[in-house]
Amino acid sequence: MSTLIRTLFLVLIAVVAAAPGWAAEPVSTGLFGSTAIGGKDTVSYHDAAVRQSHRVSEGESRYEVKYLGATWRFATQASADKFAASPAAYVPRYNGFCANALSTAEGLVRTDGQVWDFFGDKLFLFYAEPGRQRWLKGDARAFEREADKAWQAILQKR
């Protein structure tokens, strides 16, 4: 029995040590699993029609790309290919964590990709609509500077 427990303990340590979040920058994924930003197609946010309608496309499990230790889903193979060719052009700021939470020193708050906006040419995700509204009605540049400081502090601790 003690050999079984010891073996399970060693396996658990190996799994935790190999977890994607430990090696790469953190990415906003579901609590269980590695799907980024609620499975939304991060390339689709950049489409003019999506920006106008504010309705982002759901990604599908058949179009996936691994990046930063997370699984990014796409609505089409074309979107997956665009992302694979230039992921930095499509990954939301702070790798999809809530921009408002970072700007208010709340730390890393996961998002599901539903609440979002562009400030300048940058895509920001939010945990909830009040955070987005704060940025729309307030000084988004100042909020971004605060979020940037918090993000850099988090990255330096990793």
Regions found by a protein language model. Give the residues of each.
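Charged, low-complexity intrinsically disordered segments
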Residues: W22-R158
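Bacterial N-terminal signal peptides
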Residues: L8-A18
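Bacterial N-terminal signal peptides that target proteins for export
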Residues: M1-F9
